[in-house]
Amino acid sequence: MADALNVGVNLEAFSQAIHCIQALRSSVTRVFDCLKDGMKNKESQEARERAFVSEFQDNLHCVNRDLNELERLSNLVGKPSENHPLHNSGLLSLDPVHDKTPLYSQLLQAYKWSNKLQFHAGLASGLLNQQSLKRSANQMGVSAKRRPKVQPTTLALPPQYIDDVISRIDRMFPEMTIQLSRPNGSSAMLLVTLGKVLKVIVVMRSLFIDRTIVKGYNENVYTEDGKLDIWSKSNYQVFQKVTDHATTALLHYQLPQMPDVVVRSFMTWLRSYIKLFQAPCQRCGKFLQDGLPPTWRDFRTLEAFHDSCRQ
């Protein structure tokens, strides 16, 4: 029966074609490895380029040779005879194999996604309930008398407590200077000077950080009337990048029940930029990439990465 099914097929050529396919894949892999590694260390630029071109040409010749050999063997394999149909066994390929159907993995992924969605929805609901605002004065009606009184939240903290928290954080980091002001009432604004590297304007609402603007050490952070400029961006792209990362850090450090811990964690993360222009990237080992230093700091380890290397 096996001999009858093999009529018209050159099994030896078929076996050689399989080995040739493996050799072709290896040759193509060597081509991409050559492109990935680039020019190797040589005495001169010309020698590096000459060695790279020579190696690349050799790898392309190997690919061309294996491809020609595969085309030659494909003509020798032949076609199976059609005089021996597979009958009902030919329908086996139409039925899905239950062991290879990714139904369980897809259901498990959907279940995890549903649980995560429910968890984050609960967190968002709790945060929105804590920071709820009165949208209209018409709420002071008959129904308002039946509503229970709103419990005080962490948004209503005394200014003395906020000053004490900021003062303790200022003493924690000698290379960081924090100036606190309240130009618009009870809301605090911080001017954080990190060594001679950068300055950060932090807009706060009680102990919650609403906005951060990072500028260079020599840039002007005040408006014409002497107030902190909370709207103008930095003139330098590197500090614009750090501003974007600081905004991401505000979304990462979220603990409404302990806002002082959030502020301290954010200041600890911000302090890691003291070596903004001195620390190399932990992945590529370079100081500059596209003309910029490593502007990203890991939230857990505080290690420096380029924006493209952290992914």
From Swiss-Prot:
Component of the Mediator complex. Component of the Mediator complex, a coactivator involved in the regulated transcription of nearly all RNA polymerase II-dependent genes. Mediator functions as a bridge to convey information from gene-specific regulatory proteins to the basal RNA polymerase II transcription machinery. Mediator is recruited to promoters by direct interactions with regulatory proteins and serves as a scaffold for the assembly of a functional preinitiation complex with RNA polymerase II and the general transcription factors. It comes from the Eukaryota. Belongs to the Mediator complex subunit 27 family. It is found in: Nucleus. Keywords: Activator, Nucleus, Transcription, Transcription regulation. GO terms for cellular component: mediator complex. Signal peptide: none annotated. This is Mediator of RNA polymerase II transcription subunit 27. It holds the Pfam family Med27.
